[in-house]
Amino acid sequence: MKRILNIGLAGLVLLGGIAAVSAQPSGRGGQRCPSFQQQPPVLLRSSDWWNDRSGFPPTYTAGAKTLPLISVKGNKFVDPDGKTILFRGLCISDPDKIAIQGHWGKDHFVKVKEMGAMLVRIPVHPISWRERGTAEYLKLLDQAVQWCTELGMYVMLDWHSIGNLGLERLQDPMYQTTKWETYNFWDTMARHYAGHNTVAFYELFNEPAIDKPGSGQRFGIYPWEDWKKICEEEIAIIRAKNPQAIPMVAGFDWAYDLTPVRNSPINAEGIGYTVHPYANKRPQNQWLTKWEDDFGYVADKYPVMATEFGGFAAPPGAQPLGGGGRGGGGNAAYGPAIIKYLEGKGISWTVWCFDPNWGPTLISDWNYTLNSSGLFAKAAMAGEIK
């Protein structure tokens, strides 16, 4: 009864207001304004939102079945005949950066192919994804996929952020993202490249990083079990649209530490793990022991790929041309040690970075002059590092 009474009072107030408005003179000879005859303005809309499907870009199918499908069998990546494939490849820089600097084109990928790459890792930064926009960024990726298909190279898409996605505390502005944006990115990729054999790998998050107890509050603490849940949610999103894709999962410590996998692996089939084994992660006299303890053991049961590392001295007999930067540049022992270890364990790899600005670099300039690290990487891709 009280609710009915309130409605009644509101109705009286409304009617009173209407009466007051209708009683106002129009300013033209005292005539009253026909308020009840006025029609609401027609809103001009660019489209009918209920028919808008622009959020779901069409599937990219050009050359989708040109390259053989890659899948997971046990701890290996295999082709349709069951043959084990050990990938050797490299990372380019963000397509948005390359395009802005005027170097985007098939010729860039021809240079990658000339390095001997079987696999191209393509990093997509959250900031470039947002600023270029979905439709325009997909145009770049479609071109990359087309060129890689024509050149016989597979593609790994990498959501290139660094930090604690769970708490959304990231390292730098270029890496700022949210769980929602990350999930939406992978939903978009899975829809757009569903069934495309060239786009074989989805690296879910470039470098997860958390604070260690007592180390400050840069990223915050985050349990492995919670990170594992996020990864499993991403995998479910991808698999709902593209069951053949191979999701790749990274551990903490900037994608170096896979020790939690021993007791709590990701609860999903047909996936792989990634590692970034830069030389400075462990003391040189502990490399082999720590590599085995920290990530190598995982390769005994699951596929593993070292998706980022570099900073090599030139191979024997090659003229050093400088470069290197972060993570062991100039350390003559590092390159042979890590390549021999990875390939001895059957771990595929992509080296960083085919760009003259982002270290450790492989090229010294946009004339594609190979520096010491680039010369070593090219020799390694040719199987010359024994």
Task: Label the predicted regions.
Residues 18-22:
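Sec/Tat signal peptide C-region and signal peptidase I cleavage site
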Residues 104-166, 181, 227-242, 331-346:
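Aromatic-lined substrate-binding rim segments of carbohydrate-active enzymes
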Residues 67-69, 101, 174, 183-201, ...:
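Extracellular glycoside hydrolase catalytic/binding regions
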Residues 1-9:
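Bacterial N-terminal signal peptides that target proteins for export
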Residues 25-119, 252, 379:
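N-terminal carbohydrate-binding accessory modules
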Residues 94-96, 126-130, 163-165, 208, ...:
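Feature marks short, surface-exposed loop/turn motifs that line or immediately flank catalytic pockets
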Residues 8-17:
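Bacterial N-terminal signal peptides
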